[in-house]
Amino acid sequence: MEPVNQPVREAPVFERKKAGRVSPKRILFHVFTATLAVLLLYPVIWLFVSSFKESASIFTTSHSLIPDPFILSNYAEGWKGIAGQPFLTFIKNSAIIVGLSTIGAVMSSAVIAYGFARIPFKGKKFWFACMMGTLMLPHEVLMIPQYIMFAKLDWLNSFKPIVVPQFFGHAFFIFLMIQFIRTIPEELDEAARIDGCGRFACFWRIILPLIAPALATSAIFSFYWKWEELIQPLLYLNKPELYPVSLALKLFLDTESASNWGAMFAMSAVSLLPVILVFFLFQKYIVQGISTTGLK
């Protein structure tokens, strides 16, 4: 028997017009999101544009996004540094602080999260509640006790007060990883233990590779927070050769004479580049890590 070719029914004319029509709600939505994007990006755009202006004309021509004249000397002057230190020194200090803090926060949080998610112990719910309670504790409450403790340890004017506490875990990262580990079947742990894996081997060989999205998300957040942190370096570091980028930018401002706004804006733009680069390269891990932790 030959197959019968049935004629394809075309949609009515009014349905085709309705499908191709753009609703007013959709237009308003796109206009609103575009306006919001411009408002959010305008300060960053203004910063980059101002870095190519003369310091004397930055605020007198703040309404204009076209540098007149267009100069590059702000970048050369800012890169030479300030307080006897080249700006590359400040970038290296930030890289050391961010690198060590990120490694410490991510790895310690992963170990603690594995303990809460997989290992039964007495009072686990109580200690978990205490850990979550630290999220609601303002950091300012701990600043003075921590400063006194680090001063007695003779840790001032070093990276230790900024880096060492990160090796004791971060409550937000711990919670993020706990939710991720709970999505992994416990049968994998049981199979690994049957094959002779201990707790640490099970964590290192089975769990750690499977929670890579949560690790990446935590690392990105830790990078952001430590790269732009100002309060802790301001408290513990008094030597310019130890300043990170966030604290070094303050040196361009002089309350007694004219501030070098052009060099400060130029180096501020340079300091934003790693943040922007990390965001665009690893944004998929942020979405994947946060969205997956909501699954059960």
From Swiss-Prot:
It is a multi-pass membrane protein. Residues 91-282 form the ABC transmembrane type-1 domain. It holds the Pfam family BPD_transp_1. GO terms for biological process: transmembrane transport. It comes from the Bacteria. The keyword Transport applies. It is found in: Cell membrane. Keywords: Cell membrane, Membrane, Transmembrane, Transmembrane helix, Transport. The chain crosses the membrane at residues 27-47, 96-116, 126-146, 161-181, 206-226, 262-282. The keyword Membrane applies. GO terms for cellular component: plasma membrane. Belongs to the binding-protein-dependent transport system permease family. MalFG subfamily. Part of a binding-protein-dependent transport system. Probably responsible for the translocation of the substrate across the membrane. This is Probable ABC transporter permease protein YesQ. It comes from Bacillus subtilis (strain 168). The lineage of its organism: Bacteria, Bacillati, Bacillota, Bacilli, Bacillales. The gene is yesQ.
